[in-house]
Amino acid sequence: MSKTRIVFPEFTNPYIQEAIRIAKEKFSDFEAVGADNLEHACAAVKAGVADSMIAGIDYTSREVILTARDIIGVKNPRNLEKPTFSASFIFTKENQASPIGQSVFILGDAAACKHPNSEQLYDITLQTHETAAKYFKYLNHESTDSALNNFLTPRIAMLSFSTLGSGGRDETISLTQAVVEKVRETHPEILIDGEMQLDAAINPRIGEKKAPNSPVAGHANVLIVPDLNSGNILYKAMEQFGNFTAAGPILQGFNAPVSDLSRGSTVLDIVSVIEAELALIS
């Protein structure tokens, strides 16, 4: 089995070293590569010496994102003047009632795009769906169990203060609704709905009451926020109030997988990001 090579520009950091040690014991397909600095790490990915990069325990998010943008590059499938890149978080928490023993949510964008317009929000939605689909496939392990397959099917809720028009007229509501319609037109296979309040998105009882005909209400596992302000607040709330473990930010839209660690990351946080990177590359 060929191993996935992840480069770490902060290779000598003790947190990184301990996370690598644990990850090597857990994941047989993982190989760590060191680099002197952020530029050299990105160059290693660009040259194919490494499959992906994890950085940020010492570097700022701005440094990681801009260096990756300039060296690794951003995909531009729609030939935009400024192609979109974004970031998602993978949230997990033990839940014995679920088919995989844990609750899982993917949140985008909570780290990169401050005030997305409709085109950017459309790209963020598709990029986050791609991340979710790859991660859920990794968790699925090609199972034929119907309950497991249903649980690990991406279902996108476009979050808002309003549910399907209940908030009246508002620019952000109109923007979100336009994105939902565009995704449905261009990717009819994707399960998506919105705009939608968080409780309607993830609580089956409330979802049935507020959006009875929705394909995702009450069972959403991919949450798209309208801007970075609300996204970062939700990300911190899920960690601090909800006791979820967050892996990320997982940068999206780049020519190779890149993850930006929080400078407050624990060793186990870093291990979670390593696992997420392995899932996205597998």
Where are the regions that the model predicts?
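Anion-binding alpha/beta catalytic cores of soluble intermediary-metabolism enzymes, centered on
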Residues: 1-217, 221-282
